[in-house]
Structure formats: C-alpha cells, structure tokens
C-alpha cells in the first residue's frame, strides 16, 4: 500500500513504495534510458552539497565476493548549480523528486533546506547522515526542518538504533537505511574506504530492519542488498514501509521493478 509522509504543510506519497538509492540515477532524468522513472514511487537525486565537490582520487570501484566497494567522493556542482541545471527537469519528471542533501554541519543543512523550501518541484528531502552520535543526528535533522518538507534521515547500515531513534525524535518523517561503509585494499595495497553494495549486504540489512521496526516510531525505508522481488518482499514482511534499490538498477532493473506484496 502507498506510503504518505507528511509534515502538516507538505505531503509526499510513495506509490509504489520504492525509490532508487541516492547516487544510482543522477540528479534528474540522466538514467531515463536505463530505468523507466514512472515505475518509481519517487526519484532520489545524487547527493548534493552546498559547495561543489570534486571526484575522489584513486580507484572508484573494488569488487569482493557478493558485492563491491564504491568510492566516488560524491562529486556534484553544488546546490545552486544543481538547481539551475535540473529544476526544470524535475518539473517534468514522471514521479516526485527527493533531493538528497550532503552536509557537514547543521548550519549547512539549514541553509540548503531553507533554499529548497522555495523550490516547489522538490517533494521531500533525504538527509545523508554518517556514523556519528545521537546529538549530531538530532541537530542535523532539526536544521533540515527549515524546509518544512518531509525529511528522510538516511543512515548507513550498522549505525545502531540510537541514531535512528534520535532522528525520529528530532522530526524525521522516515528513516532510510542504506549502504554501509567499508574498506578494501586496492591492487597496490592502499586501503580504500567507501560504500558497500551487492547481494551480500542483504542479511545485515534484513536484520537491521527487523530490529529497528520495533524501536522507532516512524516508517522505515529499507535498502542494501535488495536485488530481487523476493528480497523486497522479505523487507516489507520484516517491517519496512518502503524500499530503496541501489546497484540492481544498473544491472537488472526488471528484477525488482514489479509490485512486491505489501
């Protein structure tokens, strides 16, 4: 069944109850030839920072059994340029647009959220959060409330229940769980840090959803290792209210873009 996120002033409904994960499909319609965006409940943009960010140096992708590590540095031209290039495209998108914000401080979050409040093409904000402490999570989510759009607090798998609970208490409309952090040696032996993707993430993700569904008072959006309809159905049965698909959209989108049994 559809999922509606509301702040009292702005509502967003996910129907169907899945989106892409941030970083998978670009900033607007760049991946339209890869994925039929009308089959998503919403499209989540690549991470957007206040100032421009350059690509990471060194290896971008390292494989391991069951998945791969991705190290990009979240390159983007900054919020002002993203709005200039993509706002008109968002207005023509076949599904709602969720802007994923990448910020270092609550002040940065507040500045970006306030800017997005005036952008009617944005249905909600997803706030990327790292493995930090509950006080920082609460401050970041509170600052994002300057937009009065529904706020989705995005946490990496393995962050712990305290961070999810802090985000919910601070006003997050939903908690999204996504790619955990990890590290691998590159061919030269240097340690590369990044996000982990692939079906090997599924057991960890399913365990996290099962536990958090009992502990937080807002909807959970499950992500990590979901590469089949069966995995999506398992997440919903475990207590997730919606799903985020990541690398499967690059390789086999048809495997997941069917309606799971809610």
Model-derived segments and their meaning:
Residues 45-50, 123-131, 174-185, 225-259:
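Glycine-rich phosphate-binding active-site loops on the catalytic face of alpha/beta enzymes
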Residues 35-38, 85-94, 113-121, 140-146, ...:
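Acidic (Asp/Glu)-rich catalytic clusters
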Residues 129-136, 163-214, 218, 252-258:
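Glycine/Thr-rich beta-alpha phosphate-binding loop at enzyme active sites
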């Amino acid at each position: 069944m559809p999922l509606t996120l509301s702040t009292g002033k702005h509502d967003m409904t996910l129907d169907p109850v899945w989106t892409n994960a941030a970083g998978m499909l670009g900033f607007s319609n760049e991946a339209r030839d890869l994925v039929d965006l009308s089959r998503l409940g919403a499209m989540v943009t690549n991470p957007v920072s206040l100032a421009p960010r350059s690509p990471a140096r060194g290896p971008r992708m390292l494989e391991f059994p069951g998945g791969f590590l991705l190290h990009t540095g979240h390159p983007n031209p900054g919020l002002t340029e993203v709005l200039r290039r993509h706002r008109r495209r968002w207005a023509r998108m076949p599904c709602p647009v969720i802007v994923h914000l990448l910020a270092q401080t609550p002040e940065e979050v507040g500045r970006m959220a306030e800017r997005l409040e005036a952008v009617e093409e944005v249905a909600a904000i997803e706030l990327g959060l790292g493995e930090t402490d509950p006080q920082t999570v609460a401050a970041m989510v509170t600052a994002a409330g300057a937009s009065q759009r529904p706020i989705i607090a995005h946490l990496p798998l393995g962050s712990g229940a305290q961070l999810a609970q802090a985000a919910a208490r601070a006003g997050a409309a939903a908690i999204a769980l996504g790619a955990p952090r990890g590290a691998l040696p590159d061919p030269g032996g240097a340690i590369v840090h990044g996000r982990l993707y692939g079906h090997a993430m599924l057991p960890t993700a399913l365990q996290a959803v099962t536990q958090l569904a009992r502990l937080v008072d807002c909807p959970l959006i499950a992500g990590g290792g979901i590469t089949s309809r069966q995995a999506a159905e398992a997440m919903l049965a475990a207590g997730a209210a919606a799903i985020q698909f990541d690398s499967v959209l690059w390789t086999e989108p048809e495997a997941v873009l069917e309606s799971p049994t809610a």
